[in-house]
UniProtKB/Swiss-Prot annotation:
Binds 2 [4Fe-4S] clusters. One cluster is coordinated with 3 cysteines and an exchangeable S-adenosyl-L-methionine. This is tRNA-2-methylthio-N(6)-dimethylallyladenosine synthase. Residues 3-124 form the MTTase N-terminal domain. Belongs to the methylthiotransferase family. MiaB subfamily. SMART domains: Elp3 (SM00729). Its cofactor is [4Fe-4S] cluster. It is an enzyme of class 2 (transferase). Residues 148-380 form the Radical SAM core domain.
Amino acid sequence: MSKKLYIKTYGCQMNVYDSVKMQDLLYPFGYEPTENIEDADVIILITCHIREKAAEKTYSELGRIKKLQDTRKKQGLNSAIIVVAGCVAQAEGEEIFSRAPYVDIVVGPQSYYNLPELISKVVRHEKHLIDLDFVEEAKFDNLPEQLYPQGASSFISVQEGCDKFCTFCVVPYTRGAEFSRNVEQVYREALKVVSSGAKEITLLGQNVNAYHGKGPDDKIFTLADLLGHLAQIPNLERLRYMTSHPIDMTDDLIKLHGTEPKLMPFLHLPVQSGSNKILKAMNRKHDRDYYFDIINRLRETRPDIVLSSDFIVGFPGETDEDFEDTLDLVRRVKYGQCYSFKYSPRPGTPGATRTDQVPEHIKSERLTILQQELTAQQLAFNESCVGSIMKVLFDRNGKFDDQIIGKTPYMQSVYIQNPNKSLLGKITDVKITKAASNSLTGEVI
């Protein structure tokens, strides 16, 4: 009889990728995924530490799991093995056992390949096991090839960690230094996902455009080299990459946007602030003019490119004038979509130690103003697509039985009626008939 594995994933696409790899890793040991936590023999939380709210979700979920464990005990059933993985695990380590002593395993992002052994030890009644080693090569060398198809759109992790040390960010401390997978590993995984039906691959990294992996004859491949190499794979129709840092937008990568048709005309390029003073305080290593120059060069190379970004409001020392600079940058760039957040002090980062923290109510006011501007831009872009014909990759079911959802080259979600789901996994021409701020509606032509 198979054992059941339940994984709940918080945070970034890298965590989503890691969750798939955990399924592949544990399947040979008899664990099959389940969407019902009550059936699980092993429960894994893949956690995010980028903001305080995200980290606290871990403990809220652990509290709910504790109630489930208590119910099982009353019914005379075995307890599930509880694993906390991801960046909260790496950042807080033993503290997790203090706050949630019923947790069995704490494992960091670079040590997932040890999960079968750790779980086996818990089965043998060992408790409070922890593995937070930072050996990036070991992770990629030991993770299995794909067993579970990811569908029409797949993630592949090609780079982990970050050397930039932005003063608001925990990633260098939870994911470690920048490390790139070798080209052969990535190419082999790409062939595997395409052979199982993927039409689109998104290359992932905390700082993906800093990729510098070894290729044949020990040649160092840039991200542009890697994308060009993968573009040669038959039946692979779309390529994307995220998340990028502005200072690593190299000439060859910008040029590739104009020469490689499989590279989608959409780029997520976080800037975080439009104020030079705040950019310097964040240690972003560039100013707003540098960012504008990249945007201009991208648009000259690929006129139809659409941009996305991340913004943080209320970083320590941010004045009304600094915030106005951010609004000015947003209005000048004109984004297709964006993500915006209030600054959240993270323990161990330089930003958290500053004495000029912005009051919470001011952060909230600024976030509301910024999000209104960003939502208006996103709606305007979506409305500009009404009446056009777009190629849509349908990759998931909708809320209703006769509905499926796909995405345009610009990462917009498109809803259509397709009762027999015959278009799932396919790229199809769709006429856009309606726009909302977060989605489009269309008809197959």
